[in-house]
A protein has these predicted regions:
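Juxtamembrane helix-loop-helix connectors linking adjacent transmembrane helices
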Residues: 31-36, 63-132
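Juxtamembrane C-cap of transmembrane helices in multi-pass membrane transport proteins
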Residues: 25-26, 96-98, 187-188
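Transmembrane helix-loop-helix hairpins at the membrane interface
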Residues: 87-88, 113, 117-215
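Structural signal for the C-terminal ends of transmembrane alpha-helices
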Residues: 53-63, 186-191
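Alpha-helical transmembrane segments in multi-pass membrane proteins
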Residues: 4-60
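Residue-level signature of transmembrane alpha-helical entry/exit and packing/kink sites
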Residues: 4-11, 35-43, 47, 74-82, ...
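Alpha-helical transmembrane segments of multipass membrane proteins
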Residues: 14-22, 46-50, 85-93, 168, ...
């Protein structure tokens, strides 16, 4: 199990290092990156590679347990916890964004809606709001949480929150991302399922992208 945890840390560390190297060397992506097919293609390829490595690390483990592929005992409780996590994230963002402007750092906010690029935007929405959350939840609140849980749920929640934040390679947005990752890990620990966090993550990303082109 320790070798698998070391492999997981190595994967997360490499992706984090690449993300920060790209952030400091190349800066933000083009302002209208969400209107380019190449953005979605590169993200989909990256997520495919990540998932392949995650499943390779998880080889030999019971997949249902390792990835928490089970329904929560109560969807009502899971939804209530999800709203609580969402409120915590909103409060953190409202408090920190005026100071750090983390919402602008990722550089995925288009200059406005461009109907001529609707198809490319739809593909990017699929990549960032569906495939991305699935891949990241399986990586962090799935395998990562499972491998860290023997050290205690508090440790697992904290480590998952911090590594999830670093994974994105951002500076100003790092505190909010850590809160987001910690909240999703808390949701995973309380529901014993990956699905509520996956739905919350996907909903959050989709709402952020749609608001970016409509507000």
């Amino acid at each position: 199990m320790r070798r698998k945890l070391a492999g997981w840390f190595a994967l997360v560390g490499v992706i984090s290092a690449i993300s920060y190297a790209g952030r400091f060397a190349g800066g933000k992506p083009p302002k209208n990156a969400l209107y380019e097919y190449s953005t979605a293609v590169s993200e989909l390829i990256l997520f495919a590679i990540i998932l392949a490595l995650v499943f390779w690390i998880a080889r030999g483990l019971p997949k249902r347990e390792a990835f928490a592929l089970r329904r929560p005992e109560s969807w009502g409780r899971a939804i209530a916890l999800g709203f609580a996590v969402l409120i915590a994230i909103a409060i953190a963002n409202a408090a920190l964004d005026p100071l750090l402007h983390g919402g602008r750092e990722q550089g995925l906010t288009p200059s406005g809606w461009q109907s001529s690029h609707a198809a490319a935007f739809a593909v990017n929405l699929f990549a960032f709001a569906i495939v991305g959350p699935i891949a990241e939840e399986l990586t962090f609140r799935g395998l990562g949480f499972y491998l860290l849980e023997p050290y205690g749920q508090t440790v697992a929640i904290a480590v998952i929150g911090i590594t999830f934040g670093l994974w994105h390679g951002l500076v100003e947005a790092l505190p909010v991302l850590i809160v987001f990752g910690t909240g999703l890990a808390f949701l995973r620990s309380r529901t014993r399922s990956i699905y509520p966090g996956m739905l919350l993550h996907a909903t959050f990303n989709a709402a952020a992208l749609l608001l970016a082109v409509t507000v």
